[in-house]
Amino acid sequence: MNIKDIARLSGVGVSTVSRVINNHPDVKQSTREKVLQIIKDSNYIPNNSARILKQNNTKNIGVLVKGVFNPFFSEMTNIIGNIIEENGYTMILQQNDFNLYQDVETMIGFVKEKRLQGVICLGGNFTEIQEDSFEDIKVPVVLTSVNTISKKGKKYYSSVGIDNSKSAYKAVRYLIERVIKDCFGLGEVNDLGVSWWRLDGYKKALGENNIDIDDELIISGEYNSGTAYENVNKLLKKRKDITAIFALSDIMALGAIKAAIDNGLDVPRDISIVGFDGMDESKYYNPSITTVKQPKKKMAETSVELLFSLITTDGENKHVILDTELVERDSCFNI
């Protein structure tokens, strides 16, 4: 009996079983109870921390997630977990949502505590990486969907991501081409990573089309629908001239659409909204969301491939940039 058998009997993914074993909070209580009962009935002994500490040569890969409740990262975690298990390793998942500061120290502690062979970081605050930031980490590191304004220390880690500035630029240009005058940017303004680059693309698109950048139309907020709804609701009550919203994530776009509708606006006739990420739920919303689709499956697969390459061959670190796709749906006005 192995973890794949437990997953099959439970009707869930391998990564879900791994989260249950590691007592991760991102599991429904009913699912947790079902998996634990099957583990008990099967007399399955998990390769947990107690066993890890007895081993000199562990085969554990850490996945450190900032935004574990974000569907985008949840889907990537499942893909990564399955590949890790298929290669004979165990995924140790740890969420990092409550650390508001730099995540390098968190990663160092994670590697040492769990005695990892390597670590993949999904999201996170790595904006102040220095040349000596990875001195205490003796295992391969892959930063995925992590953009940093720092160019230092890149030879000490690998990365997988997209060109966030270029992708955001294309999305805002798409809005502008639909004769939109006042475009509202919705994101995490104080984030100097992914959000910084997406707002950079937003500003470039406005500037190149001779549209003034109105600071009142760049609203900071957490990456969730509730905060987005509150921020858009407040702005629309003050500004009746808004004709477009560029949301830095699909989750934010969901809240923005609800706020627009609650303010009596028709989406997209009165206001157009574009999201970012391309999460699966975006195509089932009403209206379905025009979005910048990230290649999450390819990002997840490439992250694990890079990590295993570094573990098995001791090769050089690489930095991979993948293409995005602007998916046209119903939340934008069609010319």
Curated annotation (Swiss-Prot):
<protein>
    <recommendedName>
        <fullName>HTH-type transcriptional regulator MalR</fullName>
    </recommendedName>
</protein>
<feature type="DNA-binding region" description="H-T-H motif">
    <location>
        <begin position="3"/>
        <end position="22"/>
    </location>
</feature>
<feature type="domain" description="HTH lacI-type">
    <location>
        <begin position="1"/>
        <end position="55"/>
    </location>
</feature>
<dbReference type="InterPro" id="IPR000843">
    <property type="entry name" value="HTH_LacI"/>
</dbReference>
<keyword id="KW-0805">Transcription regulation</keyword>
<dbReference type="InterPro" id="IPR028082">
    <property type="entry name" value="Peripla_BP_I"/>
</dbReference>
<dbReference type="GO" id="GO:0000976">
    <property type="term" value="F:transcription cis-regulatory region binding"/>
</dbReference>
<dbReference type="Pfam" id="PF00356">
    <property type="entry name" value="LacI"/>
</dbReference>
<comment type="function">
    <text>Repressor of glucanotransferase gene expression.</text>
</comment>
<dbReference type="GO" id="GO:0003700">
    <property type="term" value="F:DNA-binding transcription factor activity"/>
</dbReference>
<dbReference type="Pfam" id="PF13377">
    <property type="entry name" value="Peripla_BP_3"/>
</dbReference>
<keyword id="KW-0238">DNA-binding</keyword>
<keyword id="KW-0804">Transcription</keyword>
<keyword id="KW-0678">Repressor</keyword>
<dbReference type="InterPro" id="IPR010982">
    <property type="entry name" value="Lambda_DNA-bd_dom_sf"/>
</dbReference>
<dbReference type="InterPro" id="IPR046335">
    <property type="entry name" value="LacI/GalR-like_sensor"/>
</dbReference>
